[in-house]
Amino acid sequence: MPCVLPQRITPKLCKIIKKYHPVYVNTHFNHPWECTPEAEKACAMLADAGCPVGNQAVLMKGVNDNPDVMLDLHRKLLKMRVRPYYIYQADLTKGTNHFRTPVSVGLEIMDKLRGHTSGLAIPYYVIDAPGGGGKIPILPQYVLGRNGNDIILRNYKYNIYTYPDVENSTQQENVVEQPYMRKRTNGRKAASPKVVPRELVPAEK
């Protein structure tokens, strides 16, 4: 409503909202051009009424499938006191296939948001799984593997770092189990652990 019908956010409505806290509002700003003065005023009124405001954008081909556009959008939202919450991968809805982008595009956007703006401006990138699977977060891979007791990490610049993990007698050298590679199936692993590429392991000094 603050995006497409900001005039509906009135002092009377905000007075009602104040009576029934907690009330949360999620908006649907998809492009920085939608962050108009009218929309900003509406969001400010909600925030002043004690209503936390979030945003759920949808990744759409030709609209916002660009890291610079998404960065601009989320910076403007923060200035409007709106917390970026989700970037949705476009749903499998009839008649909207021309808006869908590869998941790799969304991952690239998330990778380029990190390190270039406040963490408050970085939403979750999610797929609303078909068949009632719910919202599943899709993340760039920052944990590359393990070398003995060291976790091999990369940052947003793709620089490689090691972090000494807490010792665990069950860990295996050169192996790290990625969270997305496991599921609970009567205690059995669903997939093999990921082995650290040798070229990514920093040389010992």
Region locations from a protein language model:
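Conserved AdoMet/S-adenosylmethionine-binding subsite of the radical SAM
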Residues: 1-117
